């Protein structure tokens, strides 16, 4: 695996602490950006979904480098993702939990207290270069104390968006858009 600086959709390096929308690499019917949502019996929006609407940017995500405050974000190195935390959640940090109802490992935020009765995995996320198109990437989750790594894909459970899940095929190919240059909607000049 090559090691490269992670670039946004405008070919600018991604920096820790900056806010970015995670959007599909291919625009159109595949949907829009990622956001938090309530799923199943949850009273708090702690599940990460990809919005169905291709003109919806979702919620910006902030990347940090564990143990380092600055520097460039490089492919294949651990990153932590944070999204604006709802009051009801214990943490804004991305995590992986198993939803027993759909029998899938899903991306969410927070820890055990945010996903009662569900298995929560500890591990790290990395950003890896995707095969297509230019400046596109995939997110990967590696379990702690294991050599097991899985791509982050999508699963549609008819919950107002597609859940981000662990998969070994069909990764969600994404681009990062600097949130400071976009307000979260696409407009036409008409």
Swiss-Prot record:
Record-marked site positions (Reactive bond): 68-69
Gene3D superfamilies: 2.80.10.50
UniProt cross-references to Pfam families, sorted A to Z: Kunitz_legume
Superkingdom field: Eukaryota
Chief location category: secreted
Disulfide cross-links: 44-88, 142-149
SUPFAM superfamilies in alphabetical order: STI-like
Record's comment on post-translational modification: The N-terminal Asn is removed in about 50% of both the CLSI-II and CLSI-III chains.
Protein localization: Secreted
Entry annotated with the keyword NAD: no
GO molecular function: serine-type endopeptidase inhibitor activity
Subunit structure: Forms active dimers on storage in aqueous solution, possibly through formation of an intermolecular disulfide bond.
Family recorded in the similarity comment: Belongs to the protease inhibitor I3 (leguminous Kunitz-type inhibitor) family.
Job of this protein: Inhibits subtilisin-type microbial serine proteases incuding proteinase K, subtilisin BPN', subtilisin Carlsberg and subtilisin E in a non-stoichiometric manner. Weakly inhibits A.oryzae protease and some metalloproteases including pronase E. Does not inhibit trypsin, chymotrypsin, S.griseus alkaline protease or A.lyticus lysyl endopeptidase. CLSI-II has a wider inhibitory specificity than CLSI-III.
Protein name: Subtilisin inhibitor CLSI-II
Organism: Canavalia lineata (Beach bean)
């Amino acid at each position: 695996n090559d090691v490269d600086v992670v670039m946004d959709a405008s070919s600018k390096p991604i920096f820790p602490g900056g806010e970015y929308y995670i959007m599909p690499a291919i625009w159109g019917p595949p949907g829009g950006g990622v956001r938090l949502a309530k799923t199943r019996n949850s009273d708090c929006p702690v599940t990460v979904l990809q919005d169905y609407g291709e003109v919806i940017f979702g919620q910006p995500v902030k990347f940090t480098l564990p143990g380092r405050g600055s520097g460039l974000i490089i492919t294949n190195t651990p990153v932590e993702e944070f999204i604006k935390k709802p009051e009801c959640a214990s943490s804004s940090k991305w995590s992986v939990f198993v939803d027993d109802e759909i029998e899938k490992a899903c991306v969410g935020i927070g820890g055990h207290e945010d996903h009662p009765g569900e298995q929560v995995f500890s591990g790290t996320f990395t950003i890896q270069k995707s095969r297509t198109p230019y400046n596109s990437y995939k997110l990967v989750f590696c379990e702690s104390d294991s050599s097991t790594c899985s791509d982050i894909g999508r699963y549609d459970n008819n919950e107002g968006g597609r859940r981000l899940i662990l998969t070994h095929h069909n990764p969600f190919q994404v681009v990062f858009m600097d949130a400071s240059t976009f307000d979260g909607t696409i407009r036409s000049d008409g």
